[in-house]
Amino acid sequence: MDTERMKRVLERVYGPFAPTEEKQAPDALRESIRLETEAAARLRYLIRTSRACQNAFDEALRRCEARRRALHAEFFLREGERAARRRPGTPPGVLSALRQIVLIARARERLYESATENALPLAPETARRFAAECRAEESAAARLLALSMK
């Protein structure tokens, strides 16, 4: 195989070749989120297929969803702290929305620390607080999306 053809194949598999930039290692957090999302989707499919699967995998799905939410909280916390400075061309509301997401992610992390993974389902008060945090995060993310589309 000649080098040009090999380059084309590698670009198709791994993305465009950028000689000036150093290739970064795949982001472990993003990969973990992707894997947890795929696992949850597979478990949901199995649960839908039969009652026996629902009985067998219901707890596993709850734990998988909890891990995915914890990873998302960590991701929003990291990305929000990375984007704490205003960049040229960023609409003014985006930064405050990012700060809100960071605060919500921190609160969500504290919730996960207080409720261990094995203590599912959560205590009613913790579950209510967690649901409120989820709604607040979703509305902040929706506002951020709306601002970024303007």
Task: Please provide the spans of the model-predicted regions.
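Non-heme di-metal
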Residues: M1-K150
